[in-house]
């Protein structure tokens, strides 16, 4: 693929990276799919695959060689995530990549309420200091994962109070990514907020889920203490439980309620509302139709570089 503007896509077998890769292929863009397992790489027109993980800087460097732009999908939540992200940034710099588009988190800050959001801020700073041109896509909570927050008893439990969150779908984020990846220019040095067109409370989300799943889904507002206690029996490490709980705490703090027009402006269409997402994606709440979730509430398939 020498002589073309090659885009390297990490996480190409994951929920977000895979969506981006398919859209790039539909547009006839040349891309390199960076995956851990070549056997899982999708076969797409105009795409080649390279095996590399975020824990292997040398393979990353080889995988990025010849790419002009990199889509850096954030790694799975991990206490060592910053080191993994540093590997990606260093490898991209060494390989001669010119620009990185990074999937960050809405309201990322060094002391933001949502503990996993802090890694995103530090990663943004790492990218900005690398000499690479950059574009940040700060994603609000994924509407795709709301059904996974429902317990086996049909209750969403968390300390979100009556505050709102402007969740967004991965399809809409992918549409934005495909719009900004081929274009440097006006997107360089820009941070875009990825939200839906509305901000809903968890109680309102439960009502929508009830309507589509055909059973009663409710929301119970916990205190912070109750939230940590109700998750203690899962046996998850403390940092992971803190991430689950502070997802709701960030909502209660008003951190996730602002609605942005960036998706509509960049994707060329309005982002999906929750009801529209549920109507289009019945498989997202199939587990709510009588069978218990396979994993603890609050958990969701990680977006990382799979």
Give, region by region, the residue ranges found by the protein language model:
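Short, basic/glycine-rich phosphate-binding loops at helix/coil junctions
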Residues: 71
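A hydrophobic C-terminal alpha-helical subdomain
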Residues: 225-306
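Oxidoreductase cofactor-interface core, primarily capturing Rossmann-like NAD(P)-dependent enzymes
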Residues: 2-44, 55-68, 76-86, 90-99, ...
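Conserved SAM-binding strand-loop segment of SAM-dependent methyltransferases
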Residues: 48-51
């Amino acid at each position: 693929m020498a002589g073309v503007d090659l885009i390297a896509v990490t996480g190409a077998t994951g929920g977000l990276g895979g969506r981006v890769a398919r859209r790039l292929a539909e547009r006839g863009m040349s891309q390199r799919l960076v995956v851990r397992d070549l056997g899982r790489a999708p076969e797409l027109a105009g795409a080649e695959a390279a095996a590399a993980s975020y824990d292997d800087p040398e393979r990353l460097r080889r995988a990025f060689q010849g790419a002009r732009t990199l889509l850096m999908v954030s790694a799975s939540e991990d206490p060592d995530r910053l080191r993994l992200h540093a590997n990606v940034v260093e490898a991209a710099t060494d390989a001669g990549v010119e620009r990185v588009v990074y999937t960050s988190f809405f309201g990322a800050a060094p002391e933001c309420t949502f503990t996993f959001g802090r890694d995103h801020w530090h990663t943004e700073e790492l990218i900005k200091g690398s000499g690479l041109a950059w574009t940040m896509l700060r994603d609000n909570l994924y509407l795709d994962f709301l059904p996974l927050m429902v317990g086996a008893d049909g209750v969403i439990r968390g300390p979100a109070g009556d505050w709102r969150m402007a969740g967004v779908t991965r399809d809409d984020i992918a549409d934005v990514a495909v719009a900004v990846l081929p274009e440097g220019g006006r997107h360089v040095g820009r941070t875009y907020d990825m939200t839906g067109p509305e901000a809903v409370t968890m109680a309102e989300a439960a009502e929508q889920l009830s309507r589509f799943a055909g059973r009663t889904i409710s929301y119970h507002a916990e205190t912070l203490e109750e939230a940590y206690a109700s998750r203690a029996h899962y046996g998850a490490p403390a940092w992971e439980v803190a991430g689950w709980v502070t997802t709701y705490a960030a909502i209660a703090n008003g951190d996730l309620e602002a609605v942005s027009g960036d998706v509509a402006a960049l994707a060329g269409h309005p982002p999906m509302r929750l009801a529209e997402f549920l109507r289009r994606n019945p498989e997202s709440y199939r587990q709510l139709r009588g069978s218990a979730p396979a994993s603890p509430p609050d958990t969701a398939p990680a977006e990382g570089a799979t």
